[in-house]
């Protein structure tokens, strides 16, 4: 029974990938389904890579700020 559920969700993902949304509502619905699918490896991979990239960007751009330096006008 579990394998049939996986097959159905995999088939649903494959058919979704081949469809082209005709309006913004369909696109948003697809994004919502993509973000809330708990068994989606692609979602986890994209989310983890995005969070990693955001962390790297923050670390690179905030590392040169000296919080102990005297502030102007204080």
Curated annotation (Swiss-Prot):
The encoding gene: Tomm6
GO cellular component: mitochondrial outer membrane translocase complex; mitochondrion
UniProt keyword Mitochondrion present: yes
UniProt keyword Transport present: yes
Complex formation: Forms part of the preprotein translocase complex of the outer mitochondrial membrane (TOM complex) which consists of at least 7 different proteins (TOMM5, TOMM6, TOMM7, TOMM20, TOMM22, TOMM40 and TOMM70).
Stated family: Belongs to the Tom6 family.
Main localization category: mitochondrion
Organism classification: Eukaryota, Metazoa, Chordata, Craniata, Vertebrata
Subcellular location field: Mitochondrion outer membrane
Disulphide bridges: none
Domain of life: Eukaryota
Residues with PTM N-acetylalanine: 2
InterPro entries the record matches: TOMM6
Ranges annotated as biased composition (Low complexity): 1-20
The protein, known as: Mitochondrial import receptor subunit TOM6 homolog
Ranges that cross the membrane: none
GO biological process: protein transport
Alphabetic keyword roster: Acetylation, Membrane, Mitochondrion, Mitochondrion outer membrane, Protein transport, Transport
Region called Disordered, residue ranges: 1-21
């Amino acid at each position: 029974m579990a394998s049939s559920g996986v097959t159905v969700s995999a088939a649903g993902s494959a058919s979704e990938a081949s469809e082209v949304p005709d309006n913004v509502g369909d696109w948003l619905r697809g994004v919502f389904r993509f973000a809330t699918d708990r068994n989606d490896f692609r979602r986890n991979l994209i989310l983890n890579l995005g969070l990693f990239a955001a962390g790297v960007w923050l670390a690179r751009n905030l590392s040169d700020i000296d919080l102990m330096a005297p502030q102007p006008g204080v």
